[in-house]
Structures are given as C-alpha cells and as structure tokens.
UniProtKB/Swiss-Prot annotation:
Record lineage: Bacteria, Bacillati, Actinomycetota, Actinomycetes, Micrococcales
Gene (UniProt): uvrC
Keywords, sorted A to Z: Cytoplasm, DNA damage, DNA excision, DNA repair, Excision nuclease, SOS response
Domain GIY-YIG: 16-95
Official protein name in the record: UvrABC system protein C
Compartmental location: Cytoplasm
Amino acid sequence: MADPASYRPQTGEIPTNPGVYRFRDPHGRVIYVGKAKSLRSRLNSYFANPGGLLPKTYAMVHAASSVEWTVVASELESLQLEYTWIKEFKPRFNVVFRDDKTYPYLAVTMGEKFPRVQVLRGERRKGTRYFGPYTAGAIRETMDTLLRVFPVRSCSPGVLKRAQASGRPCLLGYIDKCAAPCVGRVTPEEHRALAEDFCSFMGGEAKRFIGRLEKDMAAAVAELDYERAARVRDDIIALRKVFERNAVVLAEDTDADVFALHEDELEAAVQVFHVRGGRVRGQRGWVVEKVEDFTTPDLVEHLLQQVYGEEGETQGRLPREVLVPEEPSNAAELAQWLAGLRGAKVDIRVPRRGDKAALMSTVRENAEHALKLHKSRRAGDLTNRSLALQELQEALDLPVALLRIECFDISHVQGTNVVASMVVVEDGLPKKSDYRKFSITGAAAVDDTAAMHDVLTRRFRNYLQEKAAQAEAAQLPGHQAALEAMAVASMQDTTTPAPRAKFAYPPNLVVVDGGKPQVNAAARALAELGIDDVYVVGLAKRLEEVWLPDSDFPVILPRTSEGLYLLQRIRDEAHRFAITFHRQKRGKAMTVSALDSVPGLGEAKRKALLAQFGSVKSIRTASAAELATAKGIGPSLADAIVSHFSNGAAASGAEAPSINMTTGEIIET
C-alpha cells in the first residue's frame, strides 16, 4: 500500500476554486472521483490526518498513488463533471447505490421492433421501461390481467422467430392474450400503440382507459351487440382490479418520488416510493457504503444525481416533485440539472406536515427494515468472501492480496470453432463488464496448451501496449490540460455510453482451467512477455487439484475450503462463458450459403436478396440490373455479386448447393 505522503501535493499548488478531483492507483486507473467547493480544503482533509479517516477512505488514500484535479467555473459544472466521470471511470471507491434485487419489475422493451412485456430483475437495460417493483406473485397476476386488455407480445425471441418462420402464433395468440404481430394479425405500428397504452396505464392513466372502455361498452349495448359488451365489461373489471391494488395516498394530481434513508456510521439504506396520480406505483431500494464522512444532505445529493442521471438516459420520466428527508447539498444547482433532464421544472422539497410527511415516515420505516435485512445477509456473504480470499492467498503462499483474479478457459469440439473466455473477479465478486471472449485460429488451435499460451499472450501483450501508450501520452506536453478540456466539453453529455475498458488493469492471480500442461503454458506466456508480478495457478477437473508452474505435485485444498470453493466458482463461470460463445460461433457456422463469401454482402442484404429472388439459384442466374432492384443493393454491389458467381462457377465447374449442416437439408432447389 502506498504512503499518502508520497504523492501529497503541496498546499500552495492546490487552488481554492470549486472543482473535481480524481485519485488514481499505481496502474493509472481512477479509483475515486469527488467534487468540492474549495479543492484545497477538501484535498488537504485527506492528507492532514489519514489515521482519523473512515476505514474505506483510509483504504482509498493508501490504494492511490496520485491525485489530479480540474477547476470549473461553478458548482453546477462541478456537479455535472463529477457525474460524467463517475459514469465513465466507474471508480471502485465511489458511493454506489446498489439496487435491491429482492423484488422484480414489470418491464416493456420499447427498443424492440415488437415490444415485449416481461418480468425482470437486476440492472436496468437501455430502451426498456420499468414499473414496480412488485412481489413475485402480484406481478404475475398483474401481467396476466393486463394482457387481456392490452395483448402485447410476451414471448421470448426464440418463440417469436419460430412463429414467424412457421406462420402460426404461439398459444397466447390463440387465446387472445397476444395480438400476434409475428404472423401479421396487427402491424408493427398497431402493436407498438398497444405497448404504449400498456405503459400509459401502468404510468397512472388508468382512469382514461377505463372511461374509454365504458364508452365502448355503452356503444355495444346501443347496437345490441351484447357479446362484445360483455367482453368489454370483463376488461373494465380487470383494469379496475389492477387499479385498486394501489391505494390513494396523496391528491390525485400528485406526481412525486418520495425518498427516505436510514444510516449508520458505515452504510445507508435508501427507499423511494414512486407516486403517480396520487397512488404508489412502485418502490425501489438501494444500499450504499460510505467512503467519506458524508452528511445526510451529501448522501441525498449523490442519490438524486445517480438515480435520475440513469433514469434521464433511459426513461425521461422524472416527476414534477421530489420529496427528500433533508435538503441536499447544492440544492439549487441540483434542481437546475434535474430540470434540464426532465425538460421542465423539478421541485426538491422536504415535507414537514400533512399526508406527504406521513408517507415519508412510511418510506423511512421501509429503509430501516431494508438496512437491517441487508446487514444480516451481508454479514455471512462478506465473511465467506474474505475467508475465501485469505485462505487462497495463504494456501498458495502469495505475498499480495487477491484483489483481482482472472480465469481463462478453452472450449471447442474436436478442434473446431476453438474459443477462449476470460472472466474477472474483484474482491471476491464477478465483474462482468470486464469479461472477454477470444477466437483462436491457426497453429494456436491445435491443442489446449497452444490455445492457452496464445490467449495469455494476447491478453497481456494488450496490457503492456496500453500501459506503454498511457505512459507516452502522459509525457506529452499539454496532456493534462487536453484531458481537462475534453472532460469539461463533454460534461453536458449524459447520454453517451462510457468507453469500454480494455486490458489496462492487470490481475494479481491468473487461474487456468486445466492441470500441469495448461499452467506451464500460461506461465511461459507471461515469462516471454517479461511479466513477473502476476501469479498463475491451474484447477484440474475431477480431482480438483491446484497446480503451480513447474511443480511436480499439486496443492491439495480441503474439500471444505472456502478458497477451493471460490476457485471452483470462477472456473465454472469461465467454462459457462466459453461454452456459450462456442455455441454461438458453432451455430453461425451450421448454415452454409454461397452468399456468405460475397464481399460487401452483409446479413441484411442477403435477406433482402432472398426475399426478392426466393433462392440462391435464382440470385446466381440474375443479371446485375435485376440484382440492383433489391433493397440495399447498388449497381457496384450487383456487379460484384455477378462477378463472384461467375468466378466461382469457372473455378469449380459446378454449382455447390447451400446446405443446412444441422439437418443435412439442401436449402436451395
């Protein structure tokens, strides 16, 4: 661990202006981002008395090796820049509000051609609108009820594709719980309108739809169409059943998010009730570990910044009013920022009396229970993870803590479609954003040891190249000023995805799936690159033996060892990730077509040609002028297709049919 005094800047070097600062570790990775009204005052607080810092802050300043700062013109700019950098760098020590994944959400995938209604847990996806959370039983009942009135697609992509191919809808299409856009019963536009109505109802516009259905029922009765009137009546009953589940808690015109929190010295639990049209439409929860000695206003500020920053990107459904337990720091600037995301005014208020204060008390009770539940669950989980990492470090006699572990696995079928996977574990938990896949070809695909050597060489060669590039860039004149200018210029942009991390951060331990040959191949790859601070082990299947490089005998860990269990989980995750990629690659190779090798002809254009001409045989005999009439096929590409087939026929002397390699069926006739 670094001594903070070794990189502490001179007090006179630090400006007193507002700004944003970044702590970096020895590998150059940003590990913490913060903002301050006075950079000098805030940064000096980290170095004046390190022993008096909170445990996590103490760990942060000792894990860092440098600190940088950027001066901005106002506190609003510092708020925006801090959010931008946290989103870009994902610093490990920053306050992160982790979703409570106990309850599922009702989600509508509006980003798809045919929007799909489904039940989802976990992280939010772009282009998807969420409602809830609900209990598992309630959400299934709600979804089943609403599909009677709004028959939106709810099937998986595989079921949709099979229905499109066969021309027959699934069971839900036959029982009128799906409009069956897959077979053309409704157009994509009509189906999207159904999905929009579904979202509007869940968003609080229930009375509008119930009123519309009541008019339809009255019209059906007037026309003596009693069967249709009965169906509409049943739809009204179904909608009222869903509508009445949410009790009225505030005035009917109230749209607000009500936040409350319960905290101790190290953690805080946050709960929010989403009130739309005076009714509670959803509830969410987070738990956060404190890094600095945050006050409640500081926590509220970071909470709103993260929650609405993400929702502003994906949903744009910020309410008119945000109720909080205490006024956040920089409340005026925060309200201005939220108004920019919403496109209209947002009021941040602290309820003092009345119905809103009573609802705030209820939300606070939920936060208190959530923190108790989190601590009881986390106690066992954190203890086991810490024990596993400590056992592994001691059993392998490693001098460094295992902060980051990477595991590699090779997957193939009899030497075909050889692929490899890299999975990452940090602090005992998977870090899926750092997972990587490798395709292996040529001499490296001969056997597992050659493949393992190739993958480790590629991974760590990239690490060395990126490390060298960063070092060269840091030495260029004006590099720091250029970085700051780019950051300030981009801080208004909260919609651009953060750049994907590559290989710039090395592991403490590499685990390979295999025994002595695979371990030695991996160790040889590292030695050839001159890397001597990354340790390598292998976990052999069946006997679960742990192998070290150039060792004649394995390390045997007890079957009850938490360290062995951690290695097994990492190995199994790497195997799952590798075999999934292998199956994807093998599946693409299953269907072979003469169109696949035409230069410049992608999948969409191949489909357009087949849709217009019916078969590869017809495409082969068509002229360039005829081919150019297909969607997306220009004159130059049409000439290339004709030339490709002419050259292929001359070379082979015969036409090779397209074959489905799974069934052996000849695709074209």
